[in-house]
Structures are given as structure tokens and as C-alpha cells.
Amino acid sequence: MSSVLKAFERFTIEQELQDRGEEGSIPPETLKSAVKVFVINTPNPTTRYHMLNFCLRIICSQNARASHRVGALITLFSLPSAGMQNHIRLADRSPEAQIERCEIDGFEPGTYRLIPNARANLTANEIAAYALLADDLPPTINNGTPYVHADVEGQPCDEIEQFLDRCYSVLIQAWVMVCKCMTAYDQPAGSADRRFAKYQQQGRLEARYMLQPEAQRLIQTAIRKSLVVRQYLTFELQLARRQGLLSNRYYAMVGDIGKYIENSGLTAFFLTLKYALGTKWSPLSLAAFTGELTKLRSLMMLYRDLGEQARYLALLEAPQIMDFAPGGYPLIFSYAMGVGTVLDVQMRNYTYARPFLNGYYFQIGVETARRQQGTVDNRVADDLGLTPEQRTEVTQLIDRLARGRGAGIPGGPVNPFVPPVQQQQPAAAYEDIPALEESDDDGDEDGGAGFQNGAQAPAARQGGQNDFRVQPLQDPIQAQLFMPLYPQVSNIPNHQNHQINRIGGMEHQDLLRYNENGDSQQDARGEHGNTFPNNPNQNAQSQVGDWDE
């Protein structure tokens, strides 16, 4: 039987690691489109800045063909290079298009009419057509310019530093559009705005050279539709990853943006590894996970076998990305999502509610994460030299915080927005303290301040120094955190007898049992079955420690 299981494991792994051909193998040729890419051999900043605006206009033109936009994009991303002729050779590796280089000496004054070099393969009709395309912006582009500020195009640019600042400001916006061009291109642009704000703060993006949102959308659409451009950008990302600490501004910028692009489309796979395998909690031993654990093992081996380009499977439209879809390991994916929703607040931004999400295993992950938050990794604890008392203290601290209680502060957790002096007094004001009833399915196994059915929560006594009702509402955040300790179940009718107990530093902390039938009051039982008499004259000390901490 063991041989069959080993054969099954080996078979599962080999399914993922099938022969895909050599890395440099040439696929069967298909029809290729001719793409004209413009090359400027001079470092003249005025000419290059004019070419920058020309490429932006071609991309945004409403009558430009796809090949026109592809050539304009490759030219745009090559403008910072000192040798554009050599840099554009990166695009020659693409089997999707035939790249034609057109050397340009400049533009006619006041127009976007190209002045080709003698070696350029451009006819007079093509030059006139490009000039018309540059002036044919769609009506959705305001002020006849792709920029937000209408006077940006006409500004002189006679210094290399000026050109680089403007060029990098435009290119960084184009790179940000690459981040979501394949995975969530139709989603709201909140993430793009946050990245723009980040690069403005870093000084890499000047706000004056911001493009209009419509121009940014057209750039993203052109990149999404062109595999040639995305293959070219992948080579740029790989070059940026190989750079050392002493790099130029452009590749430092590309390397930074590349962190947002890497492993896009593989989020479910990496989150499953992080929250299912990374936590190493006991539910992984479930027999239902055995087959899917073998699947994850084969996928990790496949990712390593794909090499450096594995990070850009979505950008390259690689078919191998389908192997990493969470539909191939739904149970352990559901468990990992349950763990992640408890441990990571950023999981709220991830759409994990897939049709194959198993609610049962998702709940297993949620409950496991809640129970295991206070556990201590013995190996790490041994490395730190923690004593058993210190390990117990850490566990108790996490348990207290998980129940919504602060570390020794009555009334709630520590609020960083309120000074410590104000935190010593609860800020919530109560008019009526209702009865607190525990649900039948809550066993109160985490050591929280629970009560049996019919037990009433302690309340502040009226008047005196500890009268919480006369305290001003000092902070709404602290009040919101304090109120869940006494959840409102139902209001107590006026004709029924009830009593307000004293808490916090008093000699007696009596828990009353509320009798709905109007009978005489009975002794209440706490969370561990301890009996608390209702007679306030008896000198009985409360054994529910949560109210004393």
C-alpha cells in the first residue's frame, strides 16, 4: 500500500513538472505585425522631450492603430537610455512582432512632423500620417493635451536634468498602470492614487507632470492589449532586479514598482502557503488535506523550475498560471483564508469568497486562529531563553487582549489616542445595565468573563467616587471599545426587582441572578460554578478575576 501512495505522490508532482521545452526554444512562427520604433541618437534634451510628448499623443490618439501605439510605447520606455538603438533590441526577442527602427533627427519647429534620418525607412505619407495622429486627440482629453496642466508641453527643456525629471514623472505613471493591467484593470483606481502619492512624497514624481486620468487609462489599455510591450517590460523588470545598490534613478524606480507587479495573479497560492503551511498548526494533519498538500508541494517545485520569469506569469500570459489556481486545492485554501481573516486585517481587501470556498474548512481556520493566537512556538522560545513563567505570561496577555480587556486597565484595552491618566477611568456612561445572558453554544473555554444563563453583569453603583455615569464621555473611541464588555441583551422592566452592584476596588463584588418570574432572588453562579450570595451583607469575595484585573 505504501508503494501505491508513493507512486501517487510522484505522479502528482510529475503532472506539474511536464516537459515544456527549452527556455530559448523558438515557437512556431505566426503572422507578425510591423512595429516602427523611433530612435534618437542625440542626447539633446529638447528633441527627446518633444519625442516624449509625441509618443504620448500617439498612444492617446483616437485613430491610431495598435502597431502605432506599440511602437510609441516601446519608444517611450526607451527614452531615458543613452543608447536607444541597443536598448530597443530587448523588444526583438518577442516572437509576436517585427521591430523596425526609424532614426529621427528631430521635429519641424512648432509641429509634431518628424524629421527622419537618411537611414530611416519612412515615407512622406507616413510622416504626414503620424503628424495627423499626434493632433487627433479624443474629446475625452481636456485642453488638447494629455497632461493635467495645459502649459506643460510648451515649456522649454534645454537641460538633461529637466528632461529626466519630466520623463521619469511620465514613465512612473505608465509603470503604475502596469501593476493592474492584467489582474484588476477594471477596478477603482484607489491603489494607483496611493502609489502616485507615495512617489510624489519620495520626489520621484512631480505633480506638475501628472497625466489626465483618461490618458493613464489609454496607456493601460494599450499595454494590456500588446504582448510585445509586456514582454519588453518583463525584460526591463529582470534588469532592474539584477542591479546592485549603486544603480541609476530609472532602474531603482523600476525595481521599486516591480515589487507590486511580481507574483500578480498568484495571490491565492502565496496566501495559502503563508497561512496554511506557514503557521504549522495542528489542522494540517487532517486526512482531507493530504492530497492537497501533495499538490502544493508540486506547485512549489514548479515555481522553482520556472525560474526568474515565474514572477511575471500574469504579465506574460503564461499558461502555467492556471496550475496555481486555488480551485486545485479548495479545502486547504478555505482553511488558509479562515486563518488569514483573523490574523491579517489586510485580508478584507482580498476577495476570497470563491464559488469553491468550503465554509466548514473556512470556519476551522477561523476557530484555529482564534485559539492559537496565544500559543508559543517552543523552538523560538528556547532560542530566546524564555522560562515557563514567561511563556505563560505571554499566553495570558494574548488571551486578555483577545477578550477585549486591557493589560490591567479596568474598562477596556489601552487606547493610544487617550493619555494614560484618562485611561484609568472608563469613559462610557450607562443609564441602564441590562441582563447579560450567555448563548448556549458559548462554552466560555477561553477563560473570558462569562456567566451562566440568567446571570446579570455587574454594574456601577450609583453615586460616589466610582460612579461611572457621572463621568464625562472623554473619548468616543475608548467608549466604543468599553461598551462591548456589557452587551445589551434586553432592557430590564421597571416592575421587576434588580440591584446595581459595585465593581472596581470595592469590598464586595456580587453577581446577581435575575429571576424573570418575579420570584425571590437566588444565588448566581459564575463561570466556574462558584456561588455568589445575593445578600450584600455577607462578606463574600468575588472569585471572577476578570473584574478585578
From Swiss-Prot:
- Where does the record place the region Ntail? 401-549, 405-549
- Entry keyword set: Capsid protein, Helical capsid protein, Host cytoplasm, Phosphoprotein, Ribonucleoprotein, RNA-binding, Viral nucleoprotein, Virion
Biased composition of type Polar residues is found at: 531-549
Q: Where is this region: Disordered?
A: 409-428, 437-467, 517-549
Instruction: Specify residue ranges for compositional bias: Low complexity.
Output: 412-428, 452-465
Under the GO molecular function aspect, what terms does this record hold? RNA binding; structural molecule activity
Check the record and name the InterPro entries matching this protein.
Paramyx_ncap (IPR002021)
| Name of protein | Nucleoprotein
